[in-house]
Amino acid sequence: MCGIHGIYRLDGKAVAPEMLSAMGDVTRHRGPDDEGMHIDASCGIAMRRLSIIDLAGGHQPLSNIDETLWVVCNGEIYNFRELRAELEAKGYRFKTGSDSEVLLHLYDAEGDDFVHRLNGMFEDRKSVV
């Protein structure tokens, strides 16, 4: 199981990459295959990845083509091929073969209700520390 971590600064200050890196060090045992982060001003997300699908192209966080949406996902989306084909038919372009990238475009197309279209194994609880 991967390790996902993030920071949102309510004071509006920039997120320090060192803070996300330190959080990643704590979860290194959960994702030995890869690590990545994205920082956008006062918000930062990062992941320690245990690779299952698209071992080379599944680096996370993932973004859409214009980098306006970002995602990290701990799970496996079983119906991602069908969803991807549907989204490509609507004009969405993909950068990787990762099942997680489907989440970005499905969210863009359907909003919060996109989760009802997913068939897979993923964490469905929110945790606040």
Q: Predicted segment positions?
A:
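N-terminus-centric sequence/structural signature that marks the extreme N-terminus
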Residues: 1-129
